[in-house]
Regions:
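Acidic-glycine-rich active-site phosphate/pyrophosphate-binding loop
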Residues: 80-95, 159, 174-185
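Alpha-helical metal-binding/catalytic segments enriched in His/Glu/Asp
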Residues: 71, 93-141, 183-186, 196-217, ...
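Metal-dependent amide/peptide-bond hydrolase catalytic core
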Residues: 3, 50, 183-388
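Acidic/histidine-rich catalytic neighborhood of metal-dependent amide-processing enzymes
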Residues: 108-181, 386
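Acidic/His- and Gly-rich active-site-bordering loop/insert found
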Residues: 2-102, 123-126, 355
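Short beta-strand segments
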Residues: 72-74, 133-135, 162-166, 185-187, ...
């Protein structure tokens, strides 16, 4: 194995050893990255969250001028609980050309490769900078990147492009769906099941809301807006979990349902939310004819992430196409922090090593060949940043 790839694997192995599940601190990993960069004379900015248990990191390599390219990834991972791993998920295992471990493909492989390339970045006669931006909480709320993005807007000269290194097998992804999640809570009136006339069943009303959500999902499937870059080529809506009642012989006082929209770029979530709010408002009035205690409320749940919209003549797409030779746009159904970067004014694409098919599952891995190919991409990017 080449020395440069061994260096990459050594760093990825160190990163995997940090348990950065989203509900835990990522500070040990961030401090490791900060210290590694400091060994090369690079001073990184560490941005802590309000609680002080998590942080993002921003570092610049090259001159402090406009035209920089940001390489960005999240440091947190999904949990391993409930998964049947063949080996310790936090001890990287190299086997048959694959590196196994939690986060190996999503996204510690990308982060480790960027860090391993730092000596190459420093040796290059960069005329425009490369920026490293590493966030937290992408796998939970996808909000940990926002303070980092705001800091970039405040401190960096004009950035030419942001490349999010989510696993795309090296393809340039110019579009992804947004994700918006809500929970709807229904409050009725309990009563003995022998006298349903004295109560208001929260579960019955929740069922009617679910039926309206299904109608909405079917309308999204058939409406004129189509997304040829996506599979399926329309916005999707589903109900994920339902809870309600506490005993068979009691008219249910409470019910709760969680539902999620995956919207095409250009399909606003506001229209779906307004339709549901209008429907539930009418249901609530009907319930309150029986009792003023009744209520229905819909609240934002775990996530709300903007879609990534293809940019006509976008700087990020133009650059990434030139570096990869790709000619046709592609989109993905999963969402990423790219939506937030674009929402805040940065030209953004998604392009990273490894396959999303290996993410979030037991025995997660990244192919070494994917890392080698992406290293060539970073070499071409570095050369580009050295040109006039």
């Amino acid at each position: 194995m080449r020395l440069d790839m061994q260096r990459t694997l050594d760093i990825i192995t160190r990163l995997i050893a940090f348990d950065t599940t989203s509900d835990r601190s990522n500070l040990a990993l961030i401090h490791f990255v900060r210290d590694l960069l400091a060994e090369h004379g690079i001073q990184a900015s560490v941005l802590s969250n309000a609680e002080g248990d998590k942080a993002s990191l921003l570092a610049t390599i090259g001159p402090a001028v406009a035209g920089g390219v940001v390489l960005s990834g999240h440091t947190d991972t999904v949990p391993v609980s409930g998964q049947n791993w063949s080996h310790d998920p936090y001890q990287a295992t190299l086997k048959e050309g694959r590196l196994y471990g939690r986060g190996s493909v999503d996204m510690k492989g990308f982060i480790g490769l960027c860090l391993a390339m730092v000596p190459d970045f420093l040796d290059a006669p960069l005329k425009r900078p490369l920026h490293l931006a590493f966030s937290y909480d992408e796998e939970s709320t996808c909000l940990g990147c926002l303070p980092l993005i705001d800091h970039m807007r405040d401190t960096l000269p004009d950035v030419a492009a942001v490349i999010i290194g989510e696993p795309t097998e090296g393809r340039v992804v110019s579009a992804h769906k947004g994700v918006h999640a809500w929970r709807t809570e229904v409050t009725g009136v309990p009563a003995h099941s022998s006298r349903p006339d004295l109560g208001v069943s929260a579960t019955f009303y929740a069922a009617r809301i679910i039926s309206e959500l299904e109608r909405t999902a079917n309308d999204l499937r058939t409406q004129a807006s189509r997304g040829e870059l996506f599979e399926p080529p329309y916005s999707t809506l589903h109900v994920s979990t339902i809870q309600g009642g506490n005993a068979t012989n009691i008219i249910a006082k409470d019910a709760r349902l969680h539902w999620e929209l995956r919207n095409l770029p250009g399909d606003t979530p506001d229209a779906v939310r307004a339709r549901v709010d209008d429907f539930t408002a009418r249901l609530a009035l009907e319930m309150q004819e029986h009792s003023p205690e009744c209520a229905i409320q819909t609240l934002e749940d775990y996530a709300s992430v903007p879609a990534l919209t293809p940019e006509p003549d976008g700087k990020a797409e133009t650059l990434a196409f030139a570096l990869t030779g790709q000619r046709e746009r592609c989109g993905v159904g999963f969402c990423s922090e790219a939506g937030w970067f674009q929402d805040r004014g940065f030209s953004t694409v998604v392009c990273g090593p490894g396959s999303i098919a290996q993410a979030h599952k037991a025995d997660e891995y990244i192919d070494i060949a994917e890392l080698e190919r992406y290293r060539e991409f970073l070499i071409r990017l570095t050369r580009h940043q050295c040109t006039d």
